[in-house]
From Swiss-Prot:
E.C. numbers: 7.1.1.-
The name this protein goes by in its record: NAD(P)H-quinone oxidoreductase subunit 3
GO cellular component, one term: NADH dehydrogenase complex
Any GO BP annotation: photosynthesis, light reaction
UniProt cross-references to InterPro entries, sorted A to Z: NAD(P)H_OxRDtase_bac/plastid, NADH_UbQ/plastoQ_OxRdtase_su3, NDAH_ubi_oxred_su3_sf
Family membership noted in the UniProt record: Belongs to the complex I subunit 3 family.
Function: NDH-1 shuttles electrons from an unknown electron donor, via FMN and iron-sulfur (Fe-S) centers, to quinones in the respiratory and/or the photosynthetic chain. The immediate electron acceptor for the enzyme in this species is believed to be plastoquinone. Couples the redox reaction to proton translocation, and thus conserves the redox energy in a proton gradient. Cyanobacterial NDH-1 also plays a role in inorganic carbon-concentration.
Keywords noted in UniProt: Membrane, NAD, NADP, Plastoquinone, Quinone, Thylakoid, Translocase, Transmembrane, Transmembrane helix, Transport
Top EC group: translocase
Locations listed in the record: Cellular thylakoid membrane
Species for this entry: Trichodesmium erythraeum (strain IMS101)
Membrane topology listed for this record: Multi-pass membrane protein
Taxonomic lineage from the root: Bacteria, Bacillati, Cyanobacteriota, Cyanophyceae, Oscillatoriophycideae
Length: 135
């Protein structure tokens, strides 16, 4: 016999079966989603309601701003930042490999060498293009 209660019970058991082991993850996901929403809402509700021309000016540590806020940076800053990010990400990828070096074996060692070789080629390319020169 088809019974609505038995159908809902079977559906509930199926949901519980699929979610078993993920309760902590779902709880963490819900809390980590709610905290920024609550913080932004609280800051919007508690902030002072100021209107006026001072609000549109740039803040320079309490000192009266001099000139415009638009400053054009040299492209060299971006090149250094890009090279830094590339090699910073390299260390993030190589650290777990170095920690588990003995368990991974020869194949992982060869893969890491290929990864390092590609990054060395990128460094040599950036060096030859003059991205690392400051002049």
């Amino acid at each position: 016999m088809f019974n609505r209660e038995s159908y809902l019970l079977r559906k509930y058991r199926l949901i519980v079966f699929f979610l078993s082991g993920y309760e902590y993850f779902l709880g963490f996901l819900m809390i980590s989603s709610l905290v920024p929403i609550i913080a932004l809402t609280a800051s919007k509700l508690l902030r002072p309601k100021t209107r006026g021309p001072e609000r549109r000016t740039t803040y320079e540590s309490g000192v009266e701003p001099i000139g415009g806020a638009w400053i054009q940076f040299n492209i060299r800053y971006y090149m250094f930042a890009l090279v830094f990010v590339i090699f910073d990400v390299e260390t993030v990828f190589l650290y777990p490999w170095a920690v588990a070096f003995h368990q991974l074996g020869l194949l992982a060692f060869i893969e890491a060498l290929i990864f390092i070789a590609i990054l060395v080629v990128a460094l040599v390319y950036a060096w030859r293009k003059g991205a690392l020169e400051w002049s």
